[in-house]
């Protein structure tokens, strides 16, 4: 006969660890220049973020989108991908025709920054000059 597991150990196996994740999207330069509106980005993220395959259920799943002066923060207590946040930010830029001038760059472990593309002044920097 196989012994049954104790009730306490079964409960421990079912209990899940709470995950506290916070990801930021820093948009300082584009917001100061008036190219990007931070409120529009927040509304877009609130509308488009999917949790468990459904949009519009952020509050029920403990996911919050917060706005500071030039920063959007996504705070989640359920598993949430930083890469998904980058995907949605790029989608927002494309939808507003800003993707040609702005890019999304990872600054550190939990922060993205929206930056301008750096375009070199010299077209052929490596060619021979006559």
Swiss-Prot record:
<comment type="similarity">
    <text>Belongs to the eukaryotic ribosomal protein eL22 family.</text>
</comment>
<dbReference type="Pfam" id="PF01776">
    <property type="entry name" value="Ribosomal_L22e"/>
</dbReference>
<dbReference type="InterPro" id="IPR038526">
    <property type="entry name" value="Ribosomal_eL22_sf"/>
</dbReference>
<dbReference type="GO" id="GO:0002181">
    <property type="term" value="P:cytoplasmic translation"/>
</dbReference>
<keyword id="KW-0689">Ribosomal protein</keyword>
<keyword id="KW-0687">Ribonucleoprotein</keyword>
<dbReference type="GO" id="GO:0005840">
    <property type="term" value="C:ribosome"/>
</dbReference>
<dbReference type="GO" id="GO:0003723">
    <property type="term" value="F:RNA binding"/>
</dbReference>
<dbReference type="GO" id="GO:0003735">
    <property type="term" value="F:structural constituent of ribosome"/>
</dbReference>
<protein>
    <recommendedName>
        <fullName>Large ribosomal subunit protein eL22</fullName>
    </recommendedName>
</protein>
<dbReference type="GO" id="GO:1990904">
    <property type="term" value="C:ribonucleoprotein complex"/>
</dbReference>
<dbReference type="InterPro" id="IPR002671">
    <property type="entry name" value="Ribosomal_eL22"/>
</dbReference>
